[in-house]
Amino acid sequence: MKEGKTLLKIKQNDTTQEIKQIIKPRSYELMFIINFNTSEKERNELIETYKKFITENNGEIIKVENIGEKDFAYPINKMKKGYYVLFDFKAYPDDVVRLQNLLKNNEKVVRFMVVRKNLKED
């Protein structure tokens, strides 16, 4: 994993200058709930899509835990249960925002939450 990430490339007089971000990847935990009516194949494809997004953006997957089917405490969109997945990963903050947008715009994802971990270690 790189230490700095290119924020902006400026081209002046046939030379390209890169402005590096001095932020290191941070540790996060992502919990998301997949619609219970989604097939196992679609669930696995969805999980792989998010894993691929993280790794393609210089992130690192530490752990993926398929918690499985659980009942909700209250109905969500007329559903009583969902399929829970937990990711532990490292990524750059701007990539986490993009990941959240992907999750938000996917109708198969009922709910999600991203939490930054290890504030003192980062």
Spans of model-derived segments:
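Long, contiguous binding/interaction regions
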Residues: 1-82, 90-122
